[in-house]
Each structure stands twice: as structure tokens, then as C-alpha cells.
Amino acid sequence: NVDFNSESTRRKKKQKEIVDLXNSL
């Protein structure tokens, strides 16, 4: 469960970074 939550958090963080990158272009 903890591993799943960690994976989910990492995925959301990565997605946010991608969105931020796109917005900066």
C-alpha cells in the first residue's frame, strides 16, 4: 500500500513537472 502510494505520488509529481515545463514554453 505504501509502495503504491509512493508510486502514485511520484507519477503525479512527474506529471506536474511536465505540465510546468509545457507552460514555461
Swiss-Prot record:
The lineage of its organism: Eukaryota, Metazoa, Chordata, Craniata, Vertebrata. Expressed by the venom gland. GO terms for molecular function: toxin activity. Residues 1-25 are annotated as: Disordered. One of its GO terms (biological process) is defense response. Contains 8 disulfide bonds. It comes from Naja haje haje. It is found in: Secreted. Its main location: secreted. It comes from the Eukaryota. GO terms for cellular component: extracellular region. Belongs to the CRISP family. This is Cysteine-rich venom protein 25. Not toxic when administered to crickets at doses up to 5 nmol/g. Keywords: Disulfide bond, Secreted, Toxin.
